[in-house]
Amino acid sequence: MSLWSDLGADLRAKQRLYSTPEQVYPLLRTVLADGTLANVLYRIQAMLVRWHLGPLALIPHWFNKVLNGCVIGVYAQFGPGLVLIHPVGVVVNSAVRGGRNVWIESSVVIGENRGQFPVLGDDIFIGSGAKVIGGVNIGTGARVGANAVVLHDVAPGDTVVGIPAKPLPRRA
């Protein structure tokens, strides 16, 4: 993917938050919202990595850390539709792989444990303060509740909560 197509998908995904009748200028609101600058800096970082300019990717990485309090590893990969709702305190390891339409709230940690790294499917939501640690797979359509600590795989479509995270019963 390209910088513009990924960033466009990110903004369209985020715009869904602001597409209500009372929002006169949802695109402007989206561009000025918390997390948009973090998304832009991450996408520039990812573009530089794709162009084999990894050392230069440290520049937007640094700006993201300083301006947004958000650390997304230089080699972390996310598909289009990434939404950083409130980026402060977000830490993502460089080896993490995420699919399309991953939504991340504030103070989320997605990181390594004993050389193992998480893999996130498509259409994932990770709530504020959640921790996703080690070689876990988060299935497509899964939701991780606020402050959950995920140490084991999450099945597609499941919602997990708690410490350690356990799935909620599915609604009939």
Region roles according to the model:
Residues 1-68, 172:
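Terminal amphipathic alpha-helical/low-complexity segments used for targeting or macromolecular assembly
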Residues 68, 73-74, 79-80, 85-94, ...:
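Left-handed beta-helix
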